[in-house]
Structure formats: structure tokens, C-alpha cells
Amino acid sequence: MVMSMLTIDPVTTPKERRAFARMTVDLYKDDPNFVQPLDYEFLARLNPQSNPLLANSPHQLWLARRGGRVVGRIGAIINRNYQDHYGKSAGHFGYFEAIDDRAVIDQLFDTAAQWLRARHMVEMAGPYNFSVNEECGLLVEGFDRPPAVMMPHGKPYYAPALEAMGFTKASDMFALWYPARYGFMPEKRQAFVDKVVNRPKVEVRSFDFANFESEILTAVEIFNDAWANNWGFVPLSEAEARHMASELRPIITRYNTVMCSVDGEPSAFGIVLPNINEVIGGFDGKLLPFNWAKFLWWLKVQKPKTARMPLMGIRQKLQGKPLGAAFAFKIIEMVNNSSVDHGIVNAELSWILESNKPMIAMLEDIGAVIDKRYRIYEKPLVAA
């Protein structure tokens, strides 16, 4: 039997972008833990007119086909925000998915590497879809639970395939699973937190939803300061922050947010998202015409049972100090209690860098357990 020829084709049309988005439907048809992204949301992320990052960052997508069937995909990007921040000639790959076939996987990565090399990149790292501030990391442990909102899934054969091509670990990130409940803090710690945050010059509140975009911009400004020294950090631009605000606004509520200020200066924040993957897993990527009503019913009436905390930040000048520690616990306490009030049973805290041992220890101390590991890989690009 003659095997059909494998081709790697650049994505250039709306029809091909849709094929790029939909190829995972067949790939994961036997995996009950995979959640197909909503088509409109996924395609918007690939559109430079709606995604600020792509507007100024060269990028390309490819589809692998064999016998007319899509068997893989990959994207490559020269992230200008990353370039400006680090000054490194490192290109990134993302959106990688493929059948369990080394020829397919190897040719996808060879194609992406050639594209990056032709643009003078000397290193290839990822997966980033297409940024460290979006979905990123290859799932290497924890395939037995569906991903939380805005987190990736994957196949167990991906990591061995990348390592066989010479990719090595750059960093690991964890997702921790947390049982939401009242009274999670020991009595002495609760007394410490209450004493510190109840000072006259300290304010702890929910976001002002009448000025939601402004609140998100403030949160991003804190985030950029708080995480500036962390591995892989790339600051969020104002355009990305505004884009984030528009994406989050439909699913976020006051009880999902906390803002902490000292002497009138916003100094720490936290955001929790309802885990929409609970419900969209049955939508096959389609929200309209009927699934929109199902989504609203789930969000407003049935209520989500799980959530994810993707964003928390404390200004550097407070880190390592009693007020910074108190803010961290107070943020978790507030979103925990309000989440329980609204029916949340479990929450994912993600992602946390493997090297951030103080944060991991703090979360484990309140009952969270590491149950997913994601990995960023890197590889030098040798001249062809």
C-alpha cells in the first residue's frame, strides 16, 4: 500500500484558518477531557485586526495534510513584545497539534524552524499561543482532567516527540487544584491578615464595574510591576490590556475580583474566572444559534461549579513584607468565600512557575495540590 504524500501548506484564507481551528475535533474525538475552543473566539485570536499582538508581530500558520486529510498544524511568530523586552533573536512556535506520526510532527517543526531561521532567529521556543500571556506550555503531566478556561490540553506523545528533535526544558509551570471552602486559613494567620489589612490607610474592595476597562488597565499595570523579574515575563501592552478587558467582561462579575490599595495607590489585585470549559465542552466549538442560551443559563441560573484564578499580582515594593503577604491571603480569602457563596466547589490556580516555591508552598498550605505540569521547550536554530 502506497502512503499518500504529506504536504505542509501555509494558511492563507479564511477557509484554511477554519480548518486550522477545527482539526482538533477529529484529533481528540476519543479524548473525553478535551474541550474544543469556541470557533469565533479561536479565530479572533488568529486575526491581526482583533488580536493586538499579531498586528505588529510577523507570524505564519501551517496545516499538514495527507491524502486530503488535515493531520497536523503549527504556527510560528516573532513576538515583537518579547523582542523589545529581552533583545533576543528567539522565535516562538504555538498552536501545535498532530496525529501520532513522527514524520508529520518532524515536518511541521522543520517548516516552522525554517521560517524563523529565514528571519534571522537563532532560537525556537514554545509552545506559546502566541504569547506567554495567553495559552502556553505543553502538557506533560495531568491528562486525566479537562483543562480549565484559557489553559491548553495535549497528547502524551508530544513531549517525547519534541525531545527526540532536540528540544530541551526551558521551564515548567504548575496548575494546582484547590477545594474551595470556608475557613481554610488557620486561626493565627487569619488574625494576622485581619490585623494588617484593617489599617486605616488600607482598602480592599471589588472592582468598580462602572469603570471596568480602567480597573483592568490598573490591574495590568500592577501585574507588569509584580511579575517583571519572573522567568519568561513579557509585559502586557495597553492595547493587549484593553483587548483583555473586552474578552473578560462577558464572563466576569464583581465577586470574581479584588483590588487592594495603600494610601490610595492600587497595590495588589486578583481575578477569578468561571470555568466556562464546564459547559462549552459540549458545544463542538459553536455558540450560535442555540448554545448561547445554554451558556447564559449555565452562567446565570445553573451556576458553574469550578473556577480558575489566572491573575494575581502584588507590587514588588510590598513583596516579602507583611502587607504583601497579608494582601495575598486576603485576595485568596475574598475570592474563595465569594466563590463558595456562588456555588464554586473547586478552583484551578494556574499557572505557577516551578521556581516560585514560596507561592507553591503558600497554596499547598491552604490545601491546593499540584495536578498538572506544563513545559516550555527551547532549541537552538542551527543554520541550514
Question: Which residues fall in each region the model found?
Answer:
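A conserved beta-strand-loop-helix scaffold within acyl/acetyltransferase catalytic domains
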Residues: 24-66, 74-84, 206, 211-314
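Alpha-helical subdomain
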Residues: 78-81, 361-364, 371-384
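Short beta-strand-to-coil "C-cap" segments at the C-terminal boundary of structured domains/repeats
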Residues: 4-6, 178-181, 378-384
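Acyltransferase donor/substrate-recognition loop-hinge adjacent to the catalytic core
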Residues: 152-232, 256
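Acyl-donor binding region in acyl/amide transferases
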Residues: 83-166, 171, 283-365
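Generic start-of-chain signal for non-secretory N-termini
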Residues: 1-33
